[in-house]
Amino acid sequence: MKVPGAALAVLLCTMSLCSQVFSPFGADTPIACCFSYVSKQIPRKFIVDCFETSSQCSKPGIIFETRKGRQACANPSEAWVQEYVADLKLKA
């Protein structure tokens, strides 16, 4: 007995949607996590924005975005990182 292609496609789509809905993280899966930090301080003039990584990430981190749109992970416990974050919050 052959299963029509359309029925098989519907079944596969349904299964993929269910796996998203019943996933332990669901739609709240973090977008960006830090697995390592930059080893040197990034010059402040290159930084335009920052955000904190999700609490679901294995390592805490601050992700800085540069003028060229690049992202770099920094250790939130370092003094220069805290200064940059405070400065960016004041300018927001």
UniProtKB/Swiss-Prot annotation:
Self-associates. Also heterodimer of MIP-1-alpha(4-69) and MIP-1-beta(3-69). Interacts with CCR1. CDD domains: Chemokine_CC. It comes from Canis lupus familiaris. Residues 1-19 form the signal peptide. InterPro entries: Chemokine_b/g/d, Chemokine_CC_CS, Chemokine_IL8-like_dom, Interleukin_8-like_sf. Belongs to the intercrine beta (chemokine CC) family. The keyword Signal applies. It is found in: Secreted. The lineage of its organism: Eukaryota, Metazoa, Chordata, Craniata, Vertebrata. One of its GO terms (cellular component) is cytoplasm. GO terms for biological process: antimicrobial humoral immune response mediated by antimicrobial peptide; calcium ion transport; calcium-mediated signaling; cell activation; cell chemotaxis; cell-cell signaling; chemokine-mediated signaling pathway; chemotaxis. This is C-C motif chemokine 3. Keywords: Chemotaxis, Cytokine, Disulfide bond, Inflammatory response, Secreted, Signal. SMART domains: SCY. Monokine with inflammatory and chemokinetic properties. Binds to CCR1, CCR4 and CCR5. One of the major HIV-suppressive factors produced by CD8+ T-cells. Recombinant MIP-1-alpha induces a dose-dependent inhibition of different strains of HIV-1, HIV-2, and simian immunodeficiency virus (SIV). PROSITE patterns: SMALL_CYTOKINES_CC. Disulfide bonds join 33-57, 34-73. One of its GO terms (molecular function) is kinase activity.
